[in-house]
Amino acid sequence: MKLFGSSGIRGIANKEITPELALNVGLVLGSRKKTAVIGRDPRVSAPMIEHALIAGMTATGCAVTEIGLVSTPTLAYAAREYECGVMVTASHNPSEYVGIKLWNPDGMAFDSAQQEEIEKAIEDADFSLVPWNLIGKFEEDGNAIRAHMNMIKKLVGSSSLKVVLDCGCGAGGTITPYLLQELGCEVITLNAQPDGHFPARNPEPNDENLTMLKKAVVDFGADLGIAHDGDADRMMAVDEKGNFVSGDEMLAIFGLYECSGKKGTVVVPVDTSMMVGDSLQGSEIVRTRVGDVYVAEGIKQSGAIYGGEPSGSWIFPKISYCPDGIYAAAKLVEIVKEKKLSELREELPRYATKRGALPCANDKKAEFMEKVKAKLEPLGKVLDIDGIRVEMDNGWVLVRPSGTEAKVRITAEARENVDEIFDMAEKIAKEALK
């Protein structure tokens, strides 16, 4: 039984993710943990799933503390005082989705071995209900947001910048506006009222969805704009000119400051731009599979000082292995206090990137990738942890099967003549599909 993807258990509410499934997850988890903390994002279906999880955990003897509507990084930080954390969220997915993400006390999401243990136990009904007098204690705690804010305030300096903050009607509205105000910022909020229908925009904080934020930054003469997804584990930005800052640019900017004055290891996924490595001269770049869980595992294994992925997940292991969009927002404000965001962007190297996709049936992907690997291997240094990435003198190309669609994706980046690299890879891919 496969339940977990790269972002925990996730699917459409009452179709793929049901109260029965949540109850079973709770029963299995409660049989293995003595204490747990649980929270939720503002999705309409989140309380339903949360209550089922609580019922399962307490029925098997686990003491559960409920912290209410919170961001995922707030929940992951709270988990440090429990044996595990449980977050009901579907992150950046649309409103009909819901999910369950499980956290270790160090802020690391459950790894593959832990996930497989849960899946097998559900399949085998490997749990036991406790007698009435051993049912787990249930309590509520309203202090998690304040504790998270206090931790960040100890690590980040104050600032008087004017910031436009688009919370996307997500859980970030419970913490980021208040944190930035307490740090001294003038904060103008957009979509700060949590609403599980996400009426203002799609929860994913990408360039296409942040039209309102880009305009507001210019109209209000703000120093920068900040945006979250539904559970605020992600954070993206807009510079003072109203231009969206790409994920690769954000990776490089944070990396420059985290690595300032010292050499260190930075962990990024395989689809990350050369911009990051070229900006962080002297630092070791470690590449992982795409997904913040894999980046976090890479950080822990390598002892890296920072990592993230261009979708908006920034991980600072000195505070947690969970991507923390709240801390990242405060940190970016501290950085921009010293230099404008547009100027920071201008200092980064720029390379041409080209992306495309080809249809490929899911049951043909493995055979396709073997053929592509054989053709690409002689062309450069190969990394095959997630698709096939080939690094050449002039750039790199990545051929990677989609995890959600019947497609294969091709990404090429080059210092010059990107079309040449892309066309070469596309030709090889098309031949492999025959």
Curated annotation (Swiss-Prot):
Single Gene Ontology BP annotation: carbohydrate metabolic process
Residues where Mg(2+) binds: S91, D229, D231, D233
Metal-binding found in the keyword field: yes
Domain of life: Archaea
Enzyme class: isomerase
PROSITE patterns: PGM_PMM
Molecular function via GO: magnesium ion binding; phosphoglucosamine mutase activity
Function in brief: Catalyzes the conversion of glucosamine-6-phosphate to glucosamine-1-phosphate.
Family listed: Belongs to the phosphohexose mutase family.
Name this protein carries in UniProt: Probable phosphoglucosamine mutase
Lineage, highest ranks first: Archaea, Methanobacteriati, Methanobacteriota, Stenosarchaea group, Methanomicrobia
Gene this protein is translated from: glmM
